[in-house]
Design a protein with these regions (language model features):
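C-terminal peripheral helix-coil segments that are non-catalytic and often amphipathic
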Residues: 7-10, 14, 44-60, 75-124
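All-alpha amphipathic helical-bundle segments outside canonical DNA-binding/catalytic cores
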Residues: 35-42, 59-75
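Amphipathic alpha-helical linker/stalk segments
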Residues: 1-4, 34-40, 55
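Non-catalytic, well-ordered alpha-helical scaffold segments
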Residues: 16, 20, 70-77
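Short amphipathic alpha-helical surface patches that mediate protein-protein
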Residues: 6, 24-27, 68, 77
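Active-site-adjacent scaffolding segments
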Residues: 1-7, 18-20
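Amphipathic alpha-helical segments used for helix-helix packing
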Residues: 14-37, 87-94
Length: 124
């Protein structure tokens, strides 16, 4: 799970154009995405891998059982997407350079920890 969160975070960081593309496509109500064939099939293997990781973690007594792999993927993606897509404005608001190596590393570590802590937390 650590590697998945880091990979996703780093993907958004290394490809800032992707956040712009997603933002534009959402403004357009996924107009162009709807024209592409088999889009759901592209994410099925990823969701399956997440499901497998969750099952293994539960079997090992490490992860809680009630986590939906799609919801988890959305949360993981959100942690990277929001940071990258709002880096400029948040840097001004908080008077910190969120693009600096130290800030990026801190945010990535926090994203990983947030996901791991969520997966270990017993449901209410």
């Amino acid at each position: 799970m650590d590697r998945l969160v880091r990979f996703t975070f780093r993907h958004f960081l290394a490809n800032p154009w992707f956040t712009k593309l997603l933002s534009t496509e959402n403004v357009e109500n996924a107009r162009f995405l709807k024209l592409l064939p088999d889009i759901p099939a592209l994410h099925s293997p990823l969701v399956g891998q997440i499901r497998t990781i969750l099952e293994r973690g539960h079997a090992a007594g490490v992860f809680r059982r009630d986590v939906d792999p799609i919801q988890l993927y959305i949360s993981i993606a959100a942690l990277g997407y929001f940071y990258v897509s709002n880096m400029a404005t948040l840097s001004v608001i908080f008077e910190k350079d969120l693009s600096s190596v130290s800030m990026v590393q801190e945010r990535e570590a926090q994203a990983v920890q947030m996901v791991i802590d969520y997966l270990k937390t017993k449901p209410a």
